[in-house]
Design a protein with these regions (language model features):
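N-terminal targeting signals for export/organelle localization
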Residues: 1-44, 166-169, 175
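A short beta-strand-turn-helix
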Residues: 43-64
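Short pre-active-site segment immediately N-terminal to redox-active cysteine/selenocysteine motifs
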Residues: 62-64, 69-72, 139
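Hydrophobic beta-strand anchors of alpha/beta hydrolase catalytic cores
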Residues: 65-66, 96, 143
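Conserved redox-active cysteine motifs that mediate thiol-disulfide chemistry
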Residues: 68-85
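Thiol-based oxidoreductase modules, predominantly thioredoxin-like and allied folds used
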Residues: 94-107, 121-129
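Short, internal strand/loop/helix patches
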Residues: 113-149
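Thiol-/selenol-based redox modules, centered on thioredoxin-like
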Residues: 145-175
């Protein structure tokens, strides 16, 4: 019996890891088809700076990265550190909205995190249950890449290095 369990253990670990990463172990983005069904759900959210923004207004201006994080998430900190090094070059061509997915975190905690991480130019907002549900957000580092017409260009879960963020921003800025 113990031998069968030991043989099954690697399979169980693979299933567990697959489940914890949403099936996207590598962190690579998953391409959307561009169909109307792939339209990003619209929402309005208040940023930590007190500004009301809607996805439709952001996406009307320019392509938008919608990034779900938590201030306690080490992978998010790494991901956003990579963004910090690349995004300023593309800030006039791509919007970046970071939405905290932890409802227990206050706007003050999020503002402190933004300042500590040195992320000016990136809009931050507190968790909003309907937004999290609309985007099926379960994991930190969930990201959606949304075109001007609100079509989901790509989506993914997992950390991205600075070189990949550079490619993403460059590609989105030409959309």
């Amino acid at each position: 019996m113990a031998k069968k369990f030991l043989l099954a253990l690697p399979l169980l670990l693979v299933v567990f890891i697959y489940g914890c990463t949403g099936g996207n172990i590598s962190g690579q983005a998953v391409a959307g088809s561009g169909n109307k069904a792939d339209l990003a759900p619209d929402f309005t959210i208040k940023t930590i700076d007190g500004k009301e923004v809607s996805l439709s207004s952001l996406a009307q201006e320019k392509p938008t990265v919608l990034y779900f994080f938590a201030t306690w998430c080490p992978n998010c900190a790494q991901d956003l550190a990579a963004v910090r090094n690349v995004y300023p070059k593309y800030a006039d061509k791509v919007n970046f909205l970071a939405v905290d997915l932890d409802p227990g975190e206050s706007e003050a905690q999020i503002a402190s995190y933004r300042q500590r991480m040195n992320l000016p130019g990136i809009e931050f907002a507190a968790a909003k249950r309907d937004v999290l549900a609309s985007y099926n957000v379960v994991y930190t580092t969930t990201k959606y890449f949304i075109g001007k017409d609100r079509v989901i260009l790509n989506k993914g879960v997992g950390g991205i290095d600075a070189a990949t963020w550079e490619q993403i921003f460059q590609s989105m800025s030409q959309y």
